Amino acid sequence: MKLKSISCKNFNFHKKFSKSLKENQKNILKNKTIVPAKLPISQPYWLEKPSSLGAYNVDSLQLIGRAENNPSAEFLISVEVGDATIDYRRPLIFKWNDPVKGEQNKNWIVCPKVTANIDQKVMIFSNESAQKILVTVVAHSANQKGDINIIHPQGWKVEGPTEYSLKTVDQELVLEYFISPNKNANSGVLKVQINGVDAHAMNTIVYDHITEQRWFPKSELQLVHLNLNTVPKKIGYLMGAGDLVDQHLKILKYYINQISTKDLTLKDLKNYDVVITGVRFFNVEEKAPYIANLLLKYVSQGGNLIVQYNTSYRLKTKNFYPYPLQISRDRVTQEDAQVTFLNDSHPVMNFPNKLTKNDFNNWVQERGLYFPNAWSKDYQPIFSWNDFNEEPKKGSLLIAKYGKGYYTYTGISFFRQLPAGVSGAYKLLVNIISLNND
């Protein structure tokens, strides 16, 4: 057996040999080559172009269905066996020995010379106060320096560094920027540019059971300027299975406090204008029967209670509503499902913000889940919507007057919409919070 040649189209490398290969004998061949400067970065093929809703945009039919990219560099090794020539294709990989795990390897990939990761994906502004972002600039090649600029929509102001300098590979530089809108600023996308070109971030996934994964999204974030009215309220939040609704309500300058269920009393609840239960609170709270009784007393004496979705399976109590309702598995998974207003004159549709169909544009992932499918006439349904070819679902938002207060049960996915900066969802939740304002 003889080695005839080794070549790599990615590197414009080709070298001929006439070397005999002996059985089970290692051969180490050392050669130098220059890696072309304009190799494309190793972006997963399905992320190279912007995607549409629910679908990636891939031009090459040969790539569709592949679990990963073709190798960024692949060598063709030709050997002669008798009268036949056999070609082997081998990807370029990096190998090393870990003292615990033994031999490790990962794919050789092409990175941008410099990446810029922003510490947030969405920034939400309810006023003109400045907020801070951190941009981590990393060199993947030595001696990188130049201009760095923040490109932003009209009506926004950005203050921060305009230059960077990195001498060594993997050197990091964390830059602070302060961003603020004027009163007429529109929501939009903020981008980082390096030397006049849109920058990429670099994200990495590392697990023992899969090959290390890296991808390079555009270095950008969504700026959301909320144009809405609020009524000052003191809000208590009873955390359920875990969500970030309370944290995002703080953006609106509400006083909001997470309530502990330990030793909770009706007197404690009456310190709040509004009490909100987190998602699946009555599925996970061990003291649910006692807490539910307190909450209904709180409502009857003038409180405003907002109960976010629970599932009918493994409820800790079924007595957390003032009038009968039946939780189902009804949901609307199409985030753009058309909404029908069932009661335009209801306060939740009008105060302190007038809701329109435009407020239900640009929602993410779904409208909501686990809607009731039967309820007492004491509840007022507010919306109707449905997935394609399904019956209308009217149980997403049910509001009832109970004693001196208001009780709201909702399966609307505020826990998804608020972190995504969906302004219409903020407006709707603000209106629910503002019930019982008299």
Task: Report the location of each language-model feature.
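Catalytic beta-strand/loop cores that center a nucleophilic Ser/Cys/Thr
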Residues: 331-421, 437
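Structural motif
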Residues: 273-278, 306, 407-411
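Stable alpha-helical elements in mature extracytoplasmic
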Residues: 245, 278, 291-294, 425-429
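Alpha-helical scaffolding within the catalytic cores
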Residues: 218-221, 261-264, 290-293, 391-397
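A glycine-rich, often tryptophan-bearing local segment used as a flexible ligand/cofactor-contacting loop or short
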Residues: 280-360
